[in-house]
């Protein structure tokens, strides 16, 4: 591919859909802390002055859904009624029921290693060596921008900022290599007291410049900071939020395919989540091993069946060893059955709330980001 542009977007922890994701995963974490084998599918809806938490849960644990919800909203920063959403006074509705026994009989087996997939579906994982964290640059820097927005807001450095924000970054590529940034969009909710001019200057100096490498910026780079001028009404007052509506933000920013399944609120028996994490783990280790510059993995499952129904590996012509060697290395060194990948990645632990904002991938604290299989794969492939 010759010269081209590629764009990815992200949203802040205060975006309505991300509030919903974080509540769903906070509930999941609280349950897993008491009952690691719980079955959880937690969905959240947020709108002005209210949160509704629903879904299906089978567990021996008891958790305070209302308090978990309020604490999550409080941590994000919605603590004043003038924002249209206040952790201390919003209504919290709990409509959680039990998981269907028809699903349980397919998932739970006498031999844990034969645990079936919780549903059918397709999942993708991806890695590229265009950044040190083996993630696409556009989504990486889009996440960093909104994360920086949250940091300067919470620290009080820019005390006129409010929790809701969105970013978008367009990168320029030439022959597959990054040559610069073409455009940056950052829209942030703010108080009524700040002028548009002051806000734009502050965002440029305190959010954009500290995050984006100067060598990728030029006088041709276009900046769009709050392009409509005013963004006072935001969060759930501006738009309702739902769990699972930011699946491209959660993954690779459109640089790789997506199977359609959301992550937040789902325990690891749900392969929508756990197999997508495993696919990232496999792809990242293949790239880290030097077997390819780019790698995309597709996995598919049937409900109640342990083994994947298919494994597909695409390296976009960047492979350094034969395709057959890459496929065989995956078959020999990764257990992609639901039980196997849970054990391989230690997924039955309360680590999910922090995944629910700023991306599930490219963050080294998560076990699926480890490259501990890279050396094994290098040896298998005969790479020196």
UniProtKB/Swiss-Prot annotation:
ATP binds at residues 15, 164-166, 230-231, 239, 245-246, 262, 266. Its EC number is 2.5.1.6. It is found in: Cytoplasm. One of its GO terms (cellular component) is cytoplasm. Pfam families: S-AdoMet_synt_C, S-AdoMet_synt_M, S-AdoMet_synt_N. Disulfide bonds: none annotated. Residues 99-109 are annotated as: Flexible loop. It catalyses: L-methionine + ATP + H2O = S-adenosyl-L-methionine + phosphate + diphosphate. Keywords: ATP-binding, Cytoplasm, Magnesium, Metal-binding, Nucleotide-binding, One-carbon metabolism, Potassium, Transferase. One of its GO terms (molecular function) is methionine adenosyltransferase activity. K(+) binds at residue 43. Coiled coil: none annotated. One of its GO terms (biological process) is S-adenosylmethionine biosynthetic process. Its cofactor is Mg(2+); K(+). Pathway: Amino-acid biosynthesis; S-adenosyl-L-methionine biosynthesis; S-adenosyl-L-methionine from L-methionine: step 1/1. Binds 2 divalent ions per subunit. Binds 1 potassium ion per subunit. Mg(2+) binds at residue 17. NCBIfam families: metK. Belongs to the AdoMet synthase family. Catalyzes the formation of S-adenosylmethionine (AdoMet) from methionine and ATP. The overall synthetic reaction is composed of two sequential steps, AdoMet formation and the subsequent tripolyphosphate hydrolysis which occurs prior to release of AdoMet from the enzyme. This is S-adenosylmethionine synthase. It comes from Aliivibrio salmonicida (strain LFI1238).
């Amino acid at each position: 591919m010759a010269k081209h542009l590629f764009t990815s977007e992200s949203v802040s922890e205060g975006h309505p859909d991300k509030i919903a994701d974080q509540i769903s995963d906070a509930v999941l974490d609280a349950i897993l802390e008491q009952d690691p084998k719980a079955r959880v599918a937690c969905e959240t809806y947020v709108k002005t002055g209210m949160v509704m938490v629903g879904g299906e849960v089978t567990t021996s644990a008891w958790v305070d859904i209302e308090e978990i919800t309020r604490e999550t909203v409080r941590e994000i920063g919605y603590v004043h009624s003038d924002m249209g959403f206040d952790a201390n006074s919003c209504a919290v509705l709990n409509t959680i029921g039990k998981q269907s026994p028809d699903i349980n009989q397919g998932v739970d087996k006498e031999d844990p290693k034969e645990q079936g997939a919780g549903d059918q579906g397709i999942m993708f994982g991806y890695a590229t060596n265009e950044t040190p964290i083996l993630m696409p640059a556009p989504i990486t820097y889009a996440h960093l921008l909104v994360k920086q927005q949250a940091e300067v807001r919470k620290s009080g450095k820019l005390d006129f900022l409010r929790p809701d924000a969105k970013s978008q970054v367009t990168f320029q590529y030439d022959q597959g290599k990054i040559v610069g940034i073409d455009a940056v969009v950052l829209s942030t909710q703010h108080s009524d007291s700040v002028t548009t001019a002051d806000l734009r200057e502050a965002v440029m100096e305190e959010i954009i410049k500290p995050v984006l490498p100067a060598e990728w910026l030029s006088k041709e780079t276009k900046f769009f900071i709050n392009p409509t001028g005013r963004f006072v009404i935001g969060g759930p007052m501006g738009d309702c939020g739902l769990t699972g509506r930011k699946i491209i933000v959660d993954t690779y920013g459109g640089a790789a395919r997506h199977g359609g399944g959301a992550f937040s609120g789902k325990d690891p028996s749900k392969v929508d989540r756990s197999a997508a994490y495993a696919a990232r783990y496999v792809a990242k280790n293949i790239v880290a091993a030097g077997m390819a510059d780019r790698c995309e993995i597709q996995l598919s499952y049937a409900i109640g069946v342990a083994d994947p129904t298919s494994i597909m590996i695409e390296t976009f012509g960047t492979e350094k060893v034969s395709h057959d060697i890459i496929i065989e290395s995956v078959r020999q060194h990764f257990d992609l059955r639901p039980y196997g990948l849970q054990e391989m990645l230690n997924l039955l632990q309360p680590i999910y709330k922090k995944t629910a904002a700023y991306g599930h991938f490219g963050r080294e604290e998560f076990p699926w980001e480890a490259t501990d299989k890279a050396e094994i794969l290098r040896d298998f492939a005969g790479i020196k």
